[in-house]
């Protein structure tokens, strides 16, 4: 039994981790505004490779045997797929959406990723969707519609390019969730994520080497460090440890702090003007995503009875 004080502490820390993810998008937006040489591609490459290296070094100190993982060919193929089809799009397309729009829009659009997971499981695994799942999905996509149009059928409030990158980022979020499901049961999530980031970063370097000179300004390196440390390394560690003390459904609900912090930050620091329909759309998406984690009380009791038998 986890002491209540410990559970409250890790619940608070998990909420702070979500805030960090949201705030990191603001640093990315600030970075892109400094110079056209600071592109989403460059930032993604730097973030993936440095963050991946740090996670692998940390996993080595924790005796999680990151090198030994590469001796299993199947594990390597899964991690490569996780990096290229999960970690790469969830970060690159997210940053591209931030560049052409803002951190708030990018974060909220990425929040519909779980609904693509739901659709995939319904089609491939014949998973029966609950009535709550269907209602939540309808609310989420209604929210995206309101956010994209301000509620006007003949008007797009955000550019089609921003919407395109945001939706691709959500698909990346779905792949990021689905691909490592089995491997993390056998291999440390830190090792899987670390190698996934390295493979994804190297693949981006092969596709588009970003070796041009970037502006040598203090704010460039400060913002880049913030994206890597505040947006990746610290929250990853917090979330990984929080799951030892807080139930996963609660941690998932705390993810709502990410779009909230990104939106508030965009309004305060980047002059984002939110129309009433924008707030309605944003709230619909976030609440709908949170609803997916709700389990009816009757179902919870059945699960508890099964575990006790």
Where in the sequence are the language-model features?
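Glycine-/small-residue-enriched transmembrane alpha-helix faces in small-molecule transporters
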Residues: 1-45, 155-182, 202, 304-309
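Juxtamembrane helix-entry segments on the extracytoplasmic side of multipass membrane proteins
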Residues: 6-11, 36-41, 45, 71-76, ...
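Helix-helix packing/entry segments at the starts of transmembrane helices
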Residues: 18, 46, 87, 91, ...
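Hydrophobic/aromatic residues within transmembrane alpha-helices
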Residues: 31, 43, 47, 97, ...
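Transmembrane alpha-helices of multi-pass small-molecule transport proteins
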Residues: 36-88, 116-120, 172-179, 193-211, ...
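C-terminal-most transmembrane helix of multi-pass membrane proteins
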Residues: 48, 148-150, 220, 256-309
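Specific transmembrane alpha-helical segments of multi-pass solute transporters/efflux pumps
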Residues: 62-104, 146, 228-246
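Loop-to-transmembrane alpha-helix entry segments
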Residues: 110, 123-146, 156-162, 218-221, ...
């Amino acid at each position: 039994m986890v002491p209540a004080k410990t559970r409250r502490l890790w619940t608070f820390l998990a909420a702070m981790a979500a805030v960090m993810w949201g705030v990191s998008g603001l640093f990315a937006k600030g970075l892109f505004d400094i110079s056209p040489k600071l592109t989403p591609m460059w930032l993604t490459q730097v973030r993936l490779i440095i963050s991946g290296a740090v996670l692998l070094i940390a996993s080595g100190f924790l005796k999680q045997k990151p090198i030994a993982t590469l001796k299993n060919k199947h594990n390597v193929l899964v991690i490569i797929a996780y990096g290229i089809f999960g970690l790469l799009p969830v970060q690159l397309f997210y940053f591209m959406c931030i560049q052409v729009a803002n951190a708030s829009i990018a974060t909220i659009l990425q929040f519909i990723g779980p609904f693509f997971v739901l659709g995939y499981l319904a089609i491939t695994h014949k998973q029966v969707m609950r009535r709550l799942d269907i209602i939540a999905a309808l609310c989420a996509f209604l929210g995206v519609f309101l956010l994209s149009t301000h509620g006007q059928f003949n008007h797009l409030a955000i550019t089609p390019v921003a919407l395109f990158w945001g939706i691709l980022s959500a698909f990346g979020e779905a792949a990021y969730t689905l691909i490592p499901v089995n491997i993390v049961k056998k291999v440390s999530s830190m090792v899987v994520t670390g190698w996934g980031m390295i493979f994804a970063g190297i693949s981006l370097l092969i596709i588009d080497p970003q070796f041009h000179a970037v502006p040598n300004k203090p704010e460039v390196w400060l913002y880049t460090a913030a994206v890597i440390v505040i947006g990746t390394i610290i929250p990853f560690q917090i979330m990984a440890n929080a799951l030892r003390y807080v139930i996963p459904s609660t941690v998932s609900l705390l993810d709502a702090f990410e779009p909230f912090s990104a939106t508030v930050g965009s309004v305060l620091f980047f002059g984002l003007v939110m129309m009433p329909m924008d707030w309605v759309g944003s709230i619909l998406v976030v609440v709908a995503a949170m609803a997916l984690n709700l389990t009816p009380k009757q179902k919870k009791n059945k699960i508890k009875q099964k575990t006790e038998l």
